């Protein structure tokens, strides 16, 4: 039990450092904005479609080769929290993603359709950006 608690503490400490390293920008005009959780974002799906899963609201979208993104993914894989995310991973990674309910929530950041969400949005793999105004 102690080992699991220590692992979680290390990952949370890494996330805190990761959050401080992410640049801030206007999420409506840029794919890079504030910090947080991670989701893989693939090339854009047809506008308005979300057949892959729930729509996510991500505060930032960064390329998987960015050192801080890659280090976070490697750390999660190293501690056995995720498996197989790094090998062959290409594309963008969304930062701080949470489910978006079309009925009432609004997203002032980057919206994306995601099919595999891990750790309550910490990592969501298989995402595509989506324009909700056209849904």
Swiss-Prot record:
Glycans are attached at residue 131. Disulfide bonds join 50-113, 57-107, 58-97, 114-127. GO terms for cellular component: extracellular region; fungal-type cell wall. Keywords: Cell wall, Disulfide bond, Glycoprotein, Secreted, Signal. Its main location: secreted. PROSITE patterns: HYDROPHOBIN. It holds the Pfam family Hydrophobin. GO terms for molecular function: structural constituent of cell wall. Residues 1-21 form the signal peptide. The keyword Glycoprotein applies. It is found in: Secreted; Secreted, Cell wall. Self-assembles to form functional amyloid fibrils called rodlets. Self-assembly into fibrillar rodlets occurs spontaneously at hydrophobic:hydrophilic interfaces and the rodlets further associate laterally to form amphipathic monolayers. Aerial growth, conidiation, and dispersal of filamentous fungi in the environment rely upon a capability of their secreting small amphipathic proteins called hydrophobins (HPBs) with low sequence identity. Class I can self-assemble into an outermost layer of rodlet bundles on aerial cell surfaces, conferring cellular hydrophobicity that supports fungal growth, development and dispersal; whereas Class II form highly ordered films at water-air interfaces through intermolecular interactions but contribute nothing to the rodlet structure. Belongs to the fungal hydrophobin family. This is Class I hydrophobin 15. It comes from Pleurotus ostreatus (strain PC15).
């Amino acid at each position: 039990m102690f080992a699991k608690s220590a692992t979680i503490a290390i990952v949370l400490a890494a996330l805190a450092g990761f959050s401080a390293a992410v640049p801030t920008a206007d999420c409506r005009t840029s794919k890079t904005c504030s910090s947080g959780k991670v989701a893989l974002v693939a090339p854009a799906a047809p506008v308005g479609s979300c057949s892959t899963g729930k729509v996510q609201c991500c505060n930032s979208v960064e390329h998987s080769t960015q050192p801080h993104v890659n280090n976070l993914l490697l750390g999660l894989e190293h501690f056995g929290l995720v498996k197989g995310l790094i090998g062959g991973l290409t594309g963008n990674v969304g930062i701080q993603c949470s489910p978006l309910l079309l009925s009432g929530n609004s997203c002032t950041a980057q919206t994306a359709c995601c099919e595999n969400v891990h750790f309550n949005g910490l990592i969501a793999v298989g995402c595509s950006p989506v324009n909700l105004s056209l849904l």
